[in-house]
Amino acid sequence: MFKEGNAERLAARFEYVKNNMIEAKWLTEAEAAKMKVPTIAPRSTSGQLSGPKGHIIEAVQKELAKLGFVQDQLLVGGLVIKTTLDQKAQQAAVDAVNKFYPSKAPDDLRIGLVAIRPGTGEILALYGGRDYLERQLNDATQSITQAGSTFKSFALVAALEQGIPLSSMWNGDSPQTFDDAGKPYVVSNYGNNGFGQVNLLEATKRSINTIFVPLGIKVGPTNVVDVARRAGIPESVAMMPTPSVVLGTSSPHVIDVANAYATFAAQGIKSKPFLVTQVLGSNKGVLYEATPQTEEAFSREVMADLTYALKGTITGGTGAAALALGRPVAGKTGTSQSNASAWFSAYTPQIAASVAFFRDNATQSLNGIGGMTSLTGGSFPARIWTEFMKKALKGEPIMDFPAPANIGGLEPIVMTSGGVQKPKE
C-alpha cells in the first residue's frame, strides 16, 4: 500500500526496473520511452474498511470462506450475515483501547483484544488494530507474541490434576538454577525479588518464576503443554516441553489465550471460537446456522481451585487494576522476557477476555512506553481490560465463581524445588 512521502522512491524504482528490462531486451528503447510513471492516488482513509471495523469484516470473510462460501457468493450480495459480536461489547473494546492508548507511543505498538463467551465460543468483541487501511494484519487473530506468565495457569492446572494442593509450600528465593536436559537454567523473579517459603496461592498472586519453573518440572513439562492444548492453545502454536514453557516463551495469538481462559471460566468446557452465527440467502432461507462446538477439557473441581488461585491475582496481586470492575474476577498478568510483550487475561463467569501489548519486532522492549519504566501486564493491558468489561457487562448481574474444592487438602506440604540458589550479586 502506498505510503505518503514515498513518491520519489517509487518513481526511482520504476525507472530502475524499466532500465533493467531494456538491458535484458524485454523492452525496446522506443517502448520504454512511452512508459511514464503512473499517477499515484492518495491512500484511502475512509470507507467500509477504515478503522478497527475493517479487521472484523476481513475476519468474518475468512470464516465464511472456511464454511464454504465462495467469493462470488459474497460479491453478488443479498446474503444476510449475522455474527456473534455484541454491539455494546465491541464498542466498549474500541473505546477502552482509545482511552488508554499510551501517549507518544511508537508507530509499531500493537494492541490486540478478544472477548469470548465461556461455554459457547461466541466472540463478543474483537479489536485487531486501530485502522485496517493502515495495516491489514489483525493483531487479535494473526499477530503472535510471547505469552509470558499467562502460561503459568497451565502449570497450575497440571499440578491440581496430579493432586498437588494450592497450600503446598515452595521456595520463592531468587535467583535459582535448575536442570534443563543436563544444562543449567538460571531463573529469576521480576526485579530479582525473593519471597522465601510460600504456598502456590501466594506464588500465583505474586507470579513467582522461581516457584512455577520447578512446579512445571515436578508435574512434567509435557503435561503443561498438554493442559495448554486442552485449554485451547492450538497445535499451530509451537510449545517445547522444557522448563521454560511455564514462563510463556511460546508465541500464541491473542484469541488463543482468550479461548484458553474462556475454558477456565466455563468450568472446564472448551469451545471453538467463532464469529458467524447465521447466514441467510436472498430469499431469507437459512444457508448456515452455527452450532457451538464444545468438549469437557477439565474437571469442575480443578477449575474451581484454579479460579480461586487466579482471583488472588486480582484481590492482592499483579492484576489489582481489575478490582475497579467491582465484580468477582479471576485472571493472570503476563510480561515476557525483556518486556517485549505484556498481557492481561482474565474472566468473570459471563465473559473471558485477553489484552496484549507488543511491537512488530519481538526483540524490542515496551519499556518507556506511556512514560512507564517497565510496561507490565498489570498496567495498560489490565486497565484496558477493566474499562472494556465495565461497559460490556453493564446491566448484567454480578455473579460469583464456585467455591474452591481444596484438592489435596489444606495442609502446608513442603515441596522440594530441585533448584540451587545462587548468591545475589
Predicted features and spans:
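Primarily short, surface-exposed interaction patches in extracytoplasmic proteins
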Residues: L133, V219-V257, G285-Y288
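Second-shell loop/turn segments in exported
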Residues: M1-E8, V17-K18, I22, P42-G51, ...
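Non-catalytic, structured segments within soluble enzyme domains
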Residues: M1-T84, Q91, D226-R230, E235-A238, ...
